[in-house]
Amino acid sequence: MNSEEVKAKLKAFFMSDLGVDGSVLNYDTPLFGEEIGLDSVDSLEIISFVDSNFNVSMTGVGKEPFQSIDTISAFIESHKA
């Protein structure tokens, strides 16, 4: 799976599972803050999704990879087996 496919899969997850409006969600949109408004519970769902769909563990990582779809995708790419 290339990085564009990873980003598309992540965006679909944010829209379907977390209820994020796709019209305001771009790959570089900040996920935690006023615009999207995800919270710590959502971060647990993101961790679970990444682990089960990409076989990459995000458990115990800092908040940097969670900034946007771009940063989550980059984390996945750099930690693939």
Question: What residue spans do the PLM features occupy?
Answer:
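Phosphopantetheine-dependent thiolation modules in NRPS/PKS and related acyl-activating systems
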Residues: 2-37, 46-48, 52-81
